[in-house]
Amino acid sequence: MNFDETVPLSQRLEWSDVVPLTQDDGPNPVVPIAYKEEFRETMDYFRAIYFSDERSPRALRLTEETLLLNSGNYTVWHFRRLVLEALNHDLFEELEFIERIAEDNSKNYQLWHHRRWVAEKLGPDVAGRELEFTRRVLSLDAKHYHAWSHRQWTLRALGGWEDELDYCHELLEADVFNNSAWNQRYYVITQSPLLGGLEAMRESEVSYTIKAILTNPANESSWRYLKALYKDDKESWISDPSVSSVCLNVLSRTDCFHGFALSTLLDLLCDGLRPTNEHKDSVRALANEEPETNLANLVCTILGRVDPVRANYWAWRKSKITVAAI
């Protein structure tokens, strides 16, 4: 902020021709907001130029001052876009302005909407910059919804798919529990025009996911991702030996949580998997003498014990099991 911006607008020669427009709260406001004087005056001058539709360099500067006081004001962002277009302003400078605002308030829908508008105007040449911008934001908050949404929009609208799978791997190497990174990985393999789609990527992704599962069987995200790799292909889901094998591998271990392996096996059984003796033996080894002859019922009973938070859910699943799911 330069020196002139610390001087009240009413004392600046540049604004001497403008009559500020006060906020109309009606004749008898019940609880008028006690705005700070700087904010009140800035908004009064903004209203004046907004209603006169002044699209000038000083109007652009005023929107900046106003947004620095309240970056969530949608009307100010909207008017700023009108002024930017009227002045044919350098939009690369605008990206820098947005980044300054984001340093203090990145969880601001209006800011991201404006960022998308600017990036769309600039086109594919800024794809790399947008991906780097979201990378910086996500390094501070790995689950930042707006950053992920903007990143997916950037890939879809501007490009930059080439290194995205590697970026997802980088995030998962740092934190395999990062469900946002798993979600992004699925977005990439299903949407990237460079990879051939889900079916083409399935074999390598199943291998990748099983490795992650065996490293940490208590990570629900990787189990969910594994099932998603067979979306709309139940036959492959129940017939691929890799899936039931990873369940058996985890169930045979004594050093980990078995809940997600059991729930995956339950899904397989309910979808039509015919259990082998190995499946039956692995499940019965975890039973506490529960008197169940139906394997799927037994899995639900064990899940109610090892996953008590969702005990009611597993009881409901048990009630829906058909005789075929043995």
From Swiss-Prot:
Pfam families: PPTA (PF01239)
Temperature-dependence annotation: Optimum temperature is 30-37 degrees Celsius for CTIL substrate and geranylgeranyl transferase activity.
Any one cellular-component term (Gene Ontology): CAAX-protein geranylgeranyltransferase complex
GO molecular function: CAAX-protein geranylgeranyltransferase activity; geranylgeranyl diphosphate synthase activity; protein farnesyltransferase activity; protein geranylgeranyltransferase activity; protein heterodimerization activity; protein prenyltransferase activity
InterPro entries: Prenyl_trans_a
Activity dependence on pH, as recorded: Optimum pH is 7.9-8.5 for CTIL substrate and geranylgeranyl transferase activity.
EC code: 2.5.1.58, 2.5.1.59
UniProt keyword terms in alphabetical order: Magnesium, Prenyltransferase, Repeat, Transferase
Gene3D superfamilies: Protein prenylyltransferase
Annotated PFTA repeat ranges: 55-89, 90-124, 126-160, 161-194, 201-235
Cofactors named for this entry: Mg(2+)
Reactions accelerated catalytically: L-cysteinyl-[protein] + (2E,6E)-farnesyl diphosphate = S-(2E,6E)-farnesyl-L-cysteinyl-[protein] + diphosphate; geranylgeranyl diphosphate + L-cysteinyl-[protein] = S-geranylgeranyl-L-cysteinyl-[protein] + diphosphate
Single biological process term from Gene Ontology: protein farnesylation
Family, as annotated: Belongs to the protein prenyltransferase subunit alpha family.
Known partners and oligomeric status: Heterodimer of an alpha and a beta subunit.
Functional summary from the UniProt entry: Essential subunit of both the farnesyltransferase and the geranylgeranyltransferase complex. Contributes to the transfer of a farnesyl or geranylgeranyl moiety from farnesyl or geranylgeranyl diphosphate to a cysteine at the fourth position from the C-terminus of several proteins having the C-terminal sequence Cys-aliphatic-aliphatic-X.
Protein's name according to its UniProt entry: Protein farnesyltransferase/geranylgeranyltransferase type-1 subunit alpha
